[in-house]
């Protein structure tokens, strides 16, 4: 899952920003022909590369290229005179660092150039719109401006794409020119090595060698001056590295204060980016420090070239944190160096580790902002990765929990069914108990009656012993218990009946209260209806009054119209009179006018009166209308209130009806329950009568069983006698076997002493080797050429001695395996006695070298108890051993299966073989002298205690012998059977664990079975590198977790120190083959596991469960 992210990003950014520097790349080729101009050409080409990657602003490009050129020239000026040629590792580091350091700068400049282009495009649109606004309408102007903006955007994108393609082509040409320079420098390096008289060829990785002309030989004076300059430069670089280390510590403290930690595990991409960002100056300094340590230019190149950046990265990918970077990089450096520069490896390793730990000069000049941003991105990436892992682990745990809940629900259903069945059986037993109690009371009365008769007739009687027997007491106790249970259940039933009666009474009370409430609501409804009726009557009276007033108003209107008609007539008459007055006699006319005026006054007075009456009638009419509208509004409001109250009363009534119906149904159900209980009582009485007959039959059968019991007791006594005889034979056999174990312990102690001597010799040789290497380092600065040959000769001699020592140990192991005793106990004892008394032969003296004392438990050491049978015995032999060792059954089963001496000889032979060949040599080499001496003293004390116990009288029991043998050595633990002291409860628990092996693990660790198995795996893989088990999917995708778990049991099958997380197929193949070798069937597909990043967690958990079941249950 850990894939390289930063290299890919740098590659993409490198492809985006491509300059037009084909001329500079072409100029780099002729510049590399001369030896003095080669570093300068590299500096120029790297500056061109930086300028090309910047690509955006020409002014900034020139400024950056000038600063880069001055920095590179200033840092490498001291090396131009003394070191005319540079190794391929330095060039590759220079190129990788320059590419990685300029990645972020290129991205920023591309973004700024695009932002400026977008601003120009956005500014061009409104200007064009303003120029065309005077000629066209607003709609046409907007359409044209949008079209121009889209066209300018598309043109800008096309131009950016073309520029990027040209930059990509230029960078490809520049990379090819760099490859040519690297090949040229490598050929010059070979020529220099040939001139200095050093053999061997420089290892190359995928590069084609080109033939170059030889350069003239360098004189000894030039070499000495070069060495002196290199030593001075090495000293200066070391001082600068110390300063940078202190600055690095300060930056780490600042990062820790900000909340970021460098000790978190980074992805491979982050590691690659951080390593690739080392400056070319420090890479050159690393090569110079190597040269200062060895004394020649060629040796410095030879010491730094194999430990290139790629080798260091591949070696560090297995590391745990950034703190152990120095040790891991030095180990990788020593591993990849050739045999010719073996003496230069320590100095090269130290300088390369220092160059890796220290940040570059460029990065220190840029400040801590770039480091903080890179570390923050790395930390965020790691946190996101951890969050994804936690999410998947949580989902996996939830699925496992749901499965376990489903299983528990199924078990609960089964237990409920079992509980119901037991309840039914209990009811039947209660009925039978009641019948038996009644019968017992009847029999008791009969017995009392018969005793009274015997007392009256003075007849002596004696109770039979059977009545006083244990069965009688048992039956009496059972009767008391059943009577107590019957009383308790009877009280429960009475309580239930009382509860039902109380519930019925409460329901009746609630019903009565509901009826009373219903009556009150009905009465209130009638009252509201009466009020509504009275209101209706009042409204009818008001309407009648209103009709009367309307009639009066209509009569007044008719009178007013009549008066108006008369007024019109009088006016006509007045007009006639005026006409007569003008034509006739004035006196008559005056009289008539006077009469008419009087009539007019009377008519006007009458009209005024009628007008006042009309106005008064109108006022009364309006008042009546207002009163009527007010009464109408009040009536409507009252009607609405009455309807609302009626609706509420109807709803309350409906609710009370529903409650009443529910109460009635409850009462009916209670009555039905009472009827059913009465029926059940009748049925139980009938069953009681039937069970009485069954009890009589059972009593008859009990008598027959008692007779059979007496017969079985006699047979048991006979079997006990046989058992005593066979136990005596078994004790004798155990004594013989203990004697063999004691002799084996003595031989084992002698072998451990010899192993201690060999280890002391080996340690002395190693100390001597270290002293001589230190002396070699001191003398090497004065006489380098002469001392190199001597040291090589000495190292070869030491290696030959060590190879001869290992070969002798291997021959001793083979001779020990070939000189095995015959597979019988008597011949074993005779051979052990002869070996302890007589002088030891060559095979016998070498045999104990392969047996190891109880070793301290380390992550890569085998399991102390289960390794010898599993690692050195085939599956068929293992099952035969376990089958024959389980012959020590409980004493009750020895009457059928009696072990003989030939049956036990095979386990003894395999036990001795396991003690002699179970431990691999690697495990022996990891044990210190102190541990071996302690183990020897413990084995001696245990053998002496065994001899004293064997001298004790023969009355000791077999259990004590088994305890002493278990204390003497682990072999006796394997030979003694653990089933002799197993109780029935533990035996049932063992059967349960075999059926479900994770149940015991869940009880031990707590929580679910999945989490318990996960904790067990974590505990087993403690101390193993690159193992972090948090789930059953992604934590197992590289096969290392399987190998680590199986390595704790089968260390001989899995070379864990040689495994890597990249070789997934090999890891899975080794793990599955090791598991199949002991009988664990493989249920996983290797192809699917290799190609799947997150395998099916249920399949993985099933396979891990099979491993746990095989080795732990």
Swiss-Prot record:
GO terms for biological process: cell division; face morphogenesis. Its main location: cytoplasm. It is found in: Cytoplasm, Cytoskeleton; Cytoplasm, Cytoskeleton, Spindle; Cell junction, Gap junction. Residues 59-103, 925-940 have a biased composition (Polar residues). Residues 220-259, 379-433, 473-791 form a coiled coil. Residues 1007-1112 form the Calponin-homology (CH) domain. Keywords: Cell cycle, Cell division, Cell junction, Coiled coil, Cytoplasm, Cytoskeleton, Gap junction. One of its GO terms (cellular component) is spindle. It comes from the Eukaryota. Residues 856-867 have a biased composition (Pro residues). Residues 145-154, 941-951 have a biased composition (Basic and acidic residues). InterPro entries: CH_dom, CH_dom_sf, F-actin_Monoox_Mical. Residues 338-358, 834-845, 972-981 have a biased composition (Low complexity). Residues 1-160, 284-374, 766-785, 832-902, 914-957, 972-997 are annotated as: Disordered. Involved in cytokinesis and spindle organization. May play a role in actin cytoskeleton organization and microtubule stabilization and hence required for proper cell adhesion and migration. Belongs to the cytospin-A family. May interact with both microtubules and actin cytoskeleton. This is Cytospin-A. The lineage of its organism: Eukaryota, Metazoa, Chordata, Craniata, Vertebrata.
